[in-house]
């Protein structure tokens, strides 16, 4: 689960981190009133969506009048913002963040992730702030400095000082950086973060550190013990099909191809997508129905897959380990009849009662193509999607 920038900054403020005074507004009038409350003669207005690249897409603007703020809010509220991190539809803008302006002398980067290789929370800092950290990692990895947090001892001030020296901070800034580092590390642990970024962490013209942006990703598996964070969830930013699938405990991710995929097991699902690509096809989705693939869940999975108008054929790839393939076959038949599937369906069954499952499909009288292997399944579904 992701948080909006204004939500991230509210958490930063709770931990004593320096952030701009700002207000998240639902209407243009609220945005104008927020500017009056903040004071000054320049403000920054930002569209609140779960995506980066807002500035390049016109979703961030420095304004010098309340008329500009009103025009910006009226232009964006209720519309979708398309960036390089969204799909072609973009993300809906329901709130505008109005903030005071900050005079910037230098931009830094500070972030943290759960690193699977070290099995630790790892902080990353760089002098190359304001740009994608992935670009820095690819071209100048030596400019990224790290600190690994030991879960037994927690964050240590010396780690902050070490990063601060590498960033070239002066003694006053070092104290500020240490406070920011310790606050973020404690926040990361307290609220079960999966990702945290301040990009940029700026040095103002007065020489102080300031959190100019904020990005937070939460470990979804920990939301049961984070009621406050869970309440911050904005369902408007979720893909509607993915949200619907989650209600039926289906793991679905929409893609941009034309071959629908229904598989039991995440690893097998990724392998299925790979082999479809290998044979010239493009998967329309990732969908893992899990170990308990009942008729009801299979039917719902078909509905979700076919809600994508780009889908021209469906590949069902099931390995019968926990579940029997003959039961899965009956579920597929029932689902196809219930949903009224109009596109070709290719089914590959392996494992417990696989042969019996194929017989059930063959006797169904439905236009279901039974594949003999994974390679055969991929070849058949790609041909079917191409209308061959």
UniProtKB/Swiss-Prot annotation:
Lineage of source species: Bacteria, Pseudomonadati, Pseudomonadota, Gammaproteobacteria, Alteromonadales
Metabolic or biological pathway: Carbohydrate metabolism; tricarboxylic acid cycle; succinate from succinyl-CoA (ligase route): step 1/1
Cited function: Succinyl-CoA synthetase functions in the citric acid cycle (TCA), coupling the hydrolysis of succinyl-CoA to the synthesis of either ATP or GTP and thus represents the only step of substrate-level phosphorylation in the TCA. The beta subunit provides nucleotide specificity of the enzyme and binds the substrate succinate, while the binding sites for coenzyme A and phosphate are found in the alpha subunit.
Chain positions recorded as ATP binding sites: 46, 53-55, 99, 102, 107
Domain of life: Bacteria
One example GO MF annotation: succinate-CoA ligase (GDP-forming) activity
Positions of the ATP-grasp domain: 9-244
Chain coiled-coil ranges: none
Residues that hold Mg(2+) according to the record: 199, 213
Gene name per UniProt: sucC
Keyword Cell inner membrane among UniProt keywords: no
Identification of the protein by name: Succinate--CoA ligase [ADP-forming] subunit beta
Cofactor note as given: Binds 1 Mg(2+) ion per subunit.
Gene Ontology CC annotation, any one: succinate-CoA ligase complex
Complexes and interactors: Heterotetramer of two alpha and two beta subunits.
Binding site for substrate: 264, 321-323
Needed co-factor(s): Mg(2+)
EC number: 6.2.1.5
Family, per entry: Belongs to the succinate/malate CoA ligase beta subunit family.
GO biological process entries: succinyl-CoA metabolic process; tricarboxylic acid cycle
ATP-binding among keywords: yes
Catalytic activity: succinate + ATP + CoA = succinyl-CoA + ADP + phosphate; GTP + succinate + CoA = succinyl-CoA + GDP + phosphate
Keywords, sorted A to Z: ATP-binding, Ligase, Magnesium, Metal-binding, Nucleotide-binding, Tricarboxylic acid cycle
